Amino acid sequence: MAEYKDTLNLPNTSFPMKASLSVREPEMLADWQAKGIYQKIRKARVGSKRFILHDGPPYANGHLHCGHALNKILKDIIIKSKTFSGFDAPFVPGWDCHGLPIELNVEKKVGKAGSKISPREFRAKCREYAASQIDIQRDEFQRLGVLGDWYNPYVTMDYHYEANIVRALGLMIKNGHLQQGFKPVHWCIDCGSALAEAEVDYEDKTSPSIDVAFSAVNPSEFLNCFGTQPAVKPLILPIWTTTPWTLPANEAVCLHPEIDYALIDAGNSYYIVATDLVESVMARYGISHYKTSGSAKGRVFEHFKLQHPFYKRQVPVVLAEHVTTESGTGCVHTAPAHGPDDYLVGQSYQLPLINPVMANGCFAENVELFAGISVLKANETILTVLSERNVLLASESIRHSYPHCWRHKSPMIFLATPQWFVSMDKSNLRQAIINEIDKVNWVPDWGKARISNMVENRPDWCISRQRSWGTPMPLFVHKTTRELHPDTLELIEKVAVMIEKSGIDAWFDLDSSELLGDDAKHYDKITDTMDVWLDSGISHYSVLKHNNDLDFPADVYFEGSDQHRGWFNSSLTTAVAMYGVAAYKTVLTHGYTVDAEGKKLSKSKGNYVALDKLVNQHGADILRLWVASTDYRHEVSISEEIIKRNADAYRRIRNTARFLLANLFDFNPASDCIDAKELLELDRWALKRCQLLQEEIITAYENYHFHLIYQKIHNFCAVDMGSFYLDLIKDRQYTTAKDSIARRSCQTAMYHMVKAFTIWLAPILSFTAEEIWQTIPGNNSESIFIEHWYDAWPTIDAVNMEDWEQLHIVRDEVNKALEETRQRGEIGSALAAEVTVYADAKALPKLTRLGEELRFLFITSEAKACPISQSPKGLAVTDCGVSIQVTASVHEKCARCWHRREDVGQNQEHPELCLRCVGNISGYHEERLYI
């Protein structure tokens, strides 16, 4: 055999089987950066239609995790696929830089602003810290193969951006959406600041569950409503609460106007509770003997007076729709300073809005009984006071969902404080937003209902914060009237210009008289900063509308599902408030990263998968394949086992590319491509299959169905290529003459296929695709990412794809029969066998048409097809309507092609060869038509 090895066209390539991604990827990344590949991509698409995917800014704090990788890789896949589709698709990454997490990290190092360090110095340290985090994250994002304008990102702490935040506030004021108010807001005691809805997490908490007696000041007026004769015993409206610390702020008891309330005679006292809750309430109070003495609607008790349980003041009965009979008593404790529903009721009844709690979470010194006590520790004291006054009707502990600070994980409180709000209803903003939601394409479609519900139910947006590191609210309010300065809009622009030059310190350092002159003595300068969700939310204004490479509105916003209450919401609200339209045309949402069992990733649970470890161990392309392989619309599972499965799939893809490249080692596209009319039918089938598959893949990219692309490519490698085409062409590729039509036909097809295949891969397996691209013979562009979807297909005659589908099916059945024969020990390899296929009228013509080439379909030494009527008795008929007979060949094996042929040894000069091989090494070009 040794003397004939050199006569074979054995594959050869510099493209390695072992990927060594952790070594090659950084080298390729450095090459992209050195060559300015991103800039060259943009240059190649100058004048093309733009596609804008606007990047939601991650927070500049800490190393990236798998959730970051999922998000940025998905975006990168979209950008690259759009570039291949001919769009000019710039990608400008962003970072969110103000806010509490950065403050907390800086505080650990230098202390709180205003104590060990001045606020100005503190802000400088925050800016310095955020910049260092951006550098870390920039490198980590680029390591994932994400292309973009990484050294010209948008950064919310840039002076230009900060100035535009201020200008955006001015636009919202101009349009009538800003209002100030003393309202209850989510308040984090640890932060010392108000928080927005998006900064609140709901977690389980154990709280006291108590029932408290509010006694009627005049029982007779209540009893008269039931038509009951007055009696000399107390009448109680019991309330139920899980926040006893709010009782000092109680100003009313609220009933539902249309709920039926029962008068319960319990012997020593009367109780009024919702009819539907009588049984559960009496059981809770341990009262087994009672009777119902009447029923009345809640509305009849309006304005009746009750005695506060431990203060001398009397409080009214008020009415509201938020009262339910799902739990409690149907009588709701109402403290306008400590809840949004309570506040609204208080406003409608003009109840006192008295806040007994200070910003540090402690009761003020003038609060009777509880002065100086933290509200987080006050419940026990309050229960003692209630017990001493015999008004505690029931008490137990319950586990329930309760708002917590997203950063500190500590329980929050509702606290009435002077704040600034974007009013959802003052200028009909809520309805305008809902109207815009209908115009947006939401993927998945449940996103529309989710954000609609949030907008419909959200309170006014509290945008003021009591923090140091944030964009200031550059407002002046009159010391007496508390009205904004009449020249507010002009003043805001002046401050914006100052911030653009010197940053936010320009406002904090400003003496009011510099802008107001003598008027300064009449106005207070606001020191609040703005909600960071407003910072990122106005990126449509500061970035899309101010960057000439971008457009407004964006084609796509794409973030995790938590951003329906975060960035999607703040972007939508601000855009509609500023110019009346949504900031985006389409919103895509991906799920969270979870472990293999669907549980949240956590270091404490031991299921956390470190991103840097994955990248260093497996390579970024394996991670990118993981992203593409999952349906991102649901939760996305990750584990070492899942990554290993993706690594296996990657090897199949890489080996497919390597096989194609290895068989093009002596192929020059400029001189060796043959005319389409000369292509063998199998090659024409393969090219047609690729063209059809490319259409499916492009459609899937356009629809953002990346998991379908993964499936299609994997199936193409495993089935169309691995188990069919590449298997069939080996004999022709290796044994026919180097320059024969048969071989060049195959190489021509493989050349077109590998170019198309590599571009399909490129949005997903970016590093590997570039590596393949640089190995493909011919004059290729500097980078694959400058290319379009492959369109240099040869024009081929119609191929009967159904015929080849049938041949593929029959081949699979033959392979099963060969394997069974091998298992019985009758043959070794398939080339040791001869096959007869007995086929029905549908399959027979397709098989006989191949003639002598039928054996190449089965990779056996001999093959023939006969009518099924000639099938020997007892030979099973397969599902595809054929019977298969396998026999061991009795002929000698050709030392070159390994086929067992009757003519082996007939040539005296080459006694070990079949005559076909003799011809191929003697300059005779073997003719093939089909395979």
From Swiss-Prot:
The encoding gene: ileS
Keyword Zinc: yes
Assembly information from the UniProt record: Monomer.
InterPro entries according to UniProt: aa-tRNA-synth_I_CS, aa-tRNA-synth_Ia, Anticodon_Ile_BEm, Ile-tRNA-ligase, Ile-tRNA-ligase_type1, Ile-tRNA_ligase, M/V/L/I-tRNA-synth_anticd-bd, Rossmann-like_a/b/a_fold
Domain remark from Swiss-Prot or TrEMBL: IleRS has two distinct active sites: one for aminoacylation and one for editing. The misactivated valine is translocated from the active site to the editing site, which sterically excludes the correctly activated isoleucine. The single editing site contains two valyl binding pockets, one specific for each substrate (Val-AMP or Val-tRNA(Ile)).
Cofactor note: Binds 1 zinc ion per subunit.
Enzyme type, top EC level: ligase
Motif 'KMSKS' region per record, residues: 600-604
Sequence similarity: Belongs to the class-I aminoacyl-tRNA synthetase family. IleS type 1 subfamily.
Organism: Legionella pneumophila subsp. pneumophila (strain Philadelphia 1 / ATCC 33152 / DSM 7513)
Cofactor(s) essential for the protein: Zn(2+)
Record's catalysed reaction(s): tRNA(Ile) + L-isoleucine + ATP = L-isoleucyl-tRNA(Ile) + AMP + diphosphate
Full protein name: Isoleucine--tRNA ligase
Keywords: Aminoacyl-tRNA synthetase, ATP-binding, Cytoplasm, Ligase, Metal-binding, Nucleotide-binding, Protein biosynthesis, Zinc
CDD domains associated with the record: Anticodon_Ia_Ile_BEm, IleRS_core
Enzyme Commission number(s) from the entry: 6.1.1.5
Amino acids binding L-isoleucyl-5'-AMP: E559
Function: Catalyzes the attachment of isoleucine to tRNA(Ile). As IleRS can inadvertently accommodate and process structurally similar amino acids such as valine, to avoid such errors it has two additional distinct tRNA(Ile)-dependent editing activities. One activity is designated as 'pretransfer' editing and involves the hydrolysis of activated Val-AMP. The other activity is designated 'posttransfer' editing and involves deacylation of mischarged Val-tRNA(Ile).
